[in-house]
Design a protein with these regions (language model features):
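Short, cationic-aromatic polyanion-contact patches
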Residues: 65-90
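Alpha-helix N-cap and coil->helix boundary residues
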Residues: 7, 25-26, 41, 45
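Positively charged, polyanion-binding regions of nucleic-acid-associated proteins
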Residues: 2-24
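Short acidic, hydrophobic short linear motifs in intrinsically disordered regions
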Residues: 22-33
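Short helix-coil junctions and helix-kink-helix linkers
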Residues: 31-43
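Short, low-complexity, intrinsically disordered N-terminal peptides in bacterial proteins
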Residues: 1-7, 83-92
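Charge-enriched amphipathic alpha-helical scaffolds
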Residues: 40-62
Length: 92
C-alpha cells in the first residue's frame, strides 16, 4: 500500500474511532484530513481505500443508510464501522 493509501486508511479508521457507534463519515473527510489543500484529487483513492476496508471487513459502505457493494455504488456514499445496521443483501 502506498503512503497516501495508508494515510487514507488510517484517516478513515481514525475518524470512525472518534465517532459514536453507528455514526458515519464521508470519504471526503478522510481525504481532507490527509491533504486539506488538494483533497478533491484524493477522492478516487479515498473510495478505493474504502472499498478495500469493506473487503477486509473493517467498514461498511452505505447509501441512504443501506449497505452497498463498493463495486456497484454510484454517487455519494458514507462509511461506518462494520456491523452497523441494515444490508441491501439481507438483515444486517
Amino acid at each position: 500500500m502506498a503512503d497516501t493509501e495508508r494515510a487514507l486508511a488510517d484517516a478513515i479508521v481514525g475518524l470512525l474511532d472518534q465517532r459514536a457507534d453507528g455514526a458515519t463519515i464521508c470519504p471526503s473527510e478522510a481525504a481532507r484530513r490527509v491533504d486539506p489543500e488538494s483533497w478533491r484529487d484524493l477522492m478516487p483513492d479515498a473510495r478505493a481505500v474504502a472499498a478495500r476496508l469493506v473487503d477486509d471487513g473493517t467498514v461498511e459502505m452505505t447509501q441512504r443508510g443501506i449497505v452497498v457493494d463498493p463495486a456497484t455504488a454510484r454517487g455519494p456514499v458514507r462509511l461506518r464501522r462494520a456491523g452497523g445496521g441494515a444490508s441491501a443483501w439481507g438483515p444486517g
